């Protein structure tokens, strides 16, 4: 399909637009979409728990995060994929002890937006009020930050690993998509990135 193996990572905090952009980009470029959040949600559902409950369980069970990472690294090694998740760039870059290896990423993207904007998006998506969405986001972020620091010794909000950081509150969904395509297209045209 492409002259290179394409591995694009998209990370961001809840409500920043990562899933929307990852889906659209995967469809546009004909890439697989491997989504850490979906894997995590499926694991929670299998145990009959909501995300908050399962996040608490995951704090004491690093095997949950390690399994998600292994699946993402395998997908990166296969190539032609968009990896979505807060640690996707770390996984693709081979930066974590249990997934050491060469940096497989073609492009590492971090999407961000202010908490209030993200809370409004999550509230709309999940059919809850904004205050509840804000509370859930803050709890989830606190839980994830704790897990990631304890399990991996990394701070997923350290943006130095990323090639592109974009505030999605400044543009519409279509404009954000266009900006990301403008960053990706030249990389896919090169024979040797």
Curated annotation (Swiss-Prot):
Keywords: ATP-binding, Cytoplasm, Kinase, Nucleotide-binding, Transferase
Keyword check for Nucleotide-binding: yes
Pfam families: Cytidylate_kin2
GO cellular component labels: cytoplasm
Binding, ATP: 12-20
Subcellular location: Cytoplasm
Claim: Transferase is one of the keywords in the record: yes
Annotated InterPro entries: Cyt_kin_arch (IPR011892), Cytidylate_kinase_dom (IPR011994), P-loop_NTPase (IPR027417)
Signal peptide stretch: none
GO biological process, one term: pyrimidine nucleotide metabolic process
Catalytic activity: CMP + ATP = CDP + ADP; dCMP + ATP = dCDP + ADP
EC number: 2.7.4.25
Superkingdom, natural source: Archaea
GO molecular function: ATP binding; CMP kinase activity; dCMP kinase activity
Family: Belongs to the cytidylate kinase family. Type 2 subfamily.
Protein name according to UniProt: Cytidylate kinase
Species assigned in the record: Methanopyrus kandleri (strain AV19 / DSM 6324 / JCM 9639 / NBRC 100938)
Name of the gene: cmk
């Amino acid at each position: 399909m492409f002259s290179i193996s394409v591995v694009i990572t998209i990370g961001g905090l809840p409500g920043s637009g990562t899933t929307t952009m990852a889906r659209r980009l995967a469809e546009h470029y004909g890439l697989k979409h491997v989504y850490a959040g979906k894997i995590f949600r499926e694991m929670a559902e299998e145990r009959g728990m909501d995300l908050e409950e399962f996040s608490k369980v995951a704090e004491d069970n690093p095997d949950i995060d390690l399994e998600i990472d292994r699946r993402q690294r395998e997908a990166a090694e296969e190539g032609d994929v968009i990896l979505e998740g807060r640690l996707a760039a770390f996984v693709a870059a081979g930066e974590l002890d249990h997934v050491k290896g060469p940096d497989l990423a073609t492009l590492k993207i971090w999407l961000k937006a202010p908490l209030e904007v993200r809370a409004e998006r999550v509230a709309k998506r999940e059919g809850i009020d904004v205050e509840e969405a804000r509370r859930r986001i803050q709890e989830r972020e606190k839980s994830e930050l704790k897990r990631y620091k304890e399990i991996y010794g990394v701070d997923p909000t350290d943006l130095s690993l990323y090639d592109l950081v974009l505030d999605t509150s400044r543009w519409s969904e279509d404009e954000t998509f266009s900006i990301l395509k403008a960053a990706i297209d030249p990389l896919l045209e090169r024979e040797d990135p």
